[in-house]
Amino acid sequence: MTRIFTFPALTTALTLALAAAALADDEYNVSNSLTLTGQPLGMHGVDPVSMFEAEKPEMGNATFTSAHDGVDYYFASQAAQATFEADPTAHLPQFGGFCAFGVYVGKKLDGDVRYADIVDDKLYLFVNEEIFKKYLEDKETVIHGAHAKWADIHHTPVSSL
């Protein structure tokens, strides 16, 4: 009897874990590889706190990992991890880490930390230098339009856009 109970329990747990990862993949810009905890990796392993507090983005370390909404984030230090854990949403990029300009035009494109802007204490990422320059021409319109569009595409799979 124990084996019969254990197998369905393990199957259910695995199904739920995979469903959470699949959901995160559609709503967050995550790396395909899984972390040591089995969850997808956010911001390509870059420390989200460093985007606000360091001179340049810093790569995180798996030693300092924190999960938020089914996604793991790496941090450069224990202090950065603690800062994040005190208020995760204050340090995460808008639109799940997808390119803000992409969201503005109804797409979920990769967000690259090399092309980032912080406006009103909110982090916005962009897919490349050309798109970032286009955004700089009319920041307010792009940000406002992206926030309006996000409600429509937030739960839409990337492959459907």
Each model region followed by its residue ranges:
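Cytosolic histidine kinase catalytic core of two-component systems
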Residues: Q78-A79, E130
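Bacterial N-terminal signal peptides that target proteins for export
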Residues: M1-L10
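Mature extracytoplasmic domains of secretory-pathway proteins
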Residues: Y74-F75, Q81-E85
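Intrinsically disordered, low-complexity terminal tails and linkers in eukaryotic proteins, enriched
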Residues: T2, L23-D69, T89-L161
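N-terminal signal peptide c-region/cleavage motif recognized by signal peptidases
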Residues: A19-A21
